[in-house]
Amino acid sequence: MLTKRIITTLMLNNGTLFRTKNFKPDYRFTLNFVDMWSVDEVILIDITRDLEFKDDSKKKFFQELLNISKNSYVPLTVGGGIRSLKDIEILLKNGADKIILNTASLKDPKIIQLAAKEFGSQCVVVSVDAKLK
């Protein structure tokens, strides 16, 4: 029988951490909520609308990722704005246990295999955004 796991998703927008309900921000829930409920994994998504992963706003994201990874004992899966193997390397060095590829996997499907070969298949997750009509 499969074990049930509780996984929560947190969003970061320009350095502000929040949780969403039905894709709408709900600022009442933060990392304290995550610790309180003893989740099994945290998914951290940077939804900042920047064109380049290296922009200054990403420094806030890296800092928050480091902060969360130092103060949390659950695996961190991180995504948002990943466009290259270098981006993946930066996230893994800053505390991510796994990374999420979304748009990059559509634009360049080879990045999935390259990332799995470089960093291990256990840390590569591909997500698909779907909306029912």
Can you describe what each PLM-predicted range is?
Residues 1-74, 85-86, 90-93, 107, ...:
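Conserved N-terminal beta1-alpha1 strand-loop-helix module at the mouth
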Residues 97-102, 123-125:
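Short hydrophobic/aromatic-enriched beta-strand-loop microsegments
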Residues 74-76, 80:
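A short, small-residue-rich loop immediately preceding and capping a beta-strand
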Residues 80, 101-104:
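Short beta->alpha connector loops at strand-helix junctions that form conserved
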